[in-house]
């Protein structure tokens, strides 16, 4: 899980999800693409 100020989708399987006011990126193909804004 990377914590970044600006989250971007890194591949076509990445999805931007907002949970409890926190913007996250989840990816089904590569778990290294997981990100959280913070």
From Swiss-Prot:
The entry's keywords: Ribonucleoprotein, Ribosomal protein
InterPro entries registered for this protein in UniProt: Ribosomal_bL36, Ribosomal_bL36_sp
Disulfide bonds: none
SUPFAM superfamilies, sorted: Ribosomal protein L36
Superkingdom, taxonomy of origin: Bacteria
UniProt keyword annotation of Membrane present: no
Entry keyword annotation includes Nucleotide-binding: no
One GO process term, biological-process aspect: translation
Pfam families: Ribosomal_L36
Any one GO MF annotation of this record: structural constituent of ribosome
Cellular component terms (Gene Ontology): cytoplasm; ribonucleoprotein complex; ribosome
Recorded family membership: Belongs to the bacterial ribosomal protein bL36 family.
HAMAP family, alphabetized: Ribosomal_bL36
NCBIfam families to which the protein is assigned, alphabetical: rpmJ_bact
PANTHER family named among the record's database cross-references: 50S RIBOSOMAL PROTEIN L36, CHLOROPLASTIC, LARGE RIBOSOMAL SUBUNIT PROTEIN BL36C
Protein name in the entry: Large ribosomal subunit protein bL36
Organism per entry: Baumannia cicadellinicola subsp. Homalodisca coagulata
């Amino acid at each position: 899980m990377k914590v970044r100020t600006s989250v971007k989708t890194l591949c076509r399987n990445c999805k931007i999800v907002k949970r409890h006011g926190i913007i996250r990126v989840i990816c089904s193909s590569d778990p290294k693409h997981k990100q959280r804004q913070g």
